[in-house]
């Protein structure tokens, strides 16, 4: 899980999701997991 100021989709499978006020990127590739912090 990378914690970044600006999250973005890295590949076509990445999905932007909003949970509890945080923006997350989830993907089948675990390297693409990100959270805005």
Swiss-Prot record:
Q: Which Pfam families match?
A: Ribosomal_L36 (PF00444)
Q: Which UniProt keywords apply?
A: Plastid, Ribonucleoprotein, Ribosomal protein
Give GO terms for biological process: translation
Q: Where in the cell is it found?
A: Plastid
The family database entries (InterPro entries) matched by this protein are listed as:
Ribosomal_bL36 (IPR000473), Ribosomal_bL36_sp (IPR035977)
GO MF terms here are: structural constituent of ribosome
- Please give the chief subcellular localization of this protein: plastid
- What PROSITE patterns does UniProt report for this protein, alphabetically? RIBOSOMAL_L36
- Looking at the UniProt record for this protein, which Gene Ontology cellular component terms does it annotate, in alphabetical order? plastid; ribonucleoprotein complex; ribosome
Q: Does the keyword Ion transport apply?
A: no
Report the SUPFAM superfamilies cross-referenced here.
Answer: Ribosomal protein L36
| Coiled-coil blocks | none
Q: Does the keyword DNA damage apply?
A: no
| Record family assignment | Belongs to the bacterial ribosomal protein bL36 family.
Q: What NCBIfam families does this protein's entry cite?
A: rpmJ_bact
User: What name does this protein carry?
Assistant: Large ribosomal subunit protein bL36c
Q: Which organism is it from?
A: Cuscuta exaltata (Tall dodder)
């Amino acid at each position: 899980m990378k914690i970044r100021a600006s999250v973005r989709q890295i590949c076509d499978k990445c999905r932007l999701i909003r949970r509890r006020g945080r923006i997350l990127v989830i993907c089948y590739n675990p390297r693409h997991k990100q959270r805005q912090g």
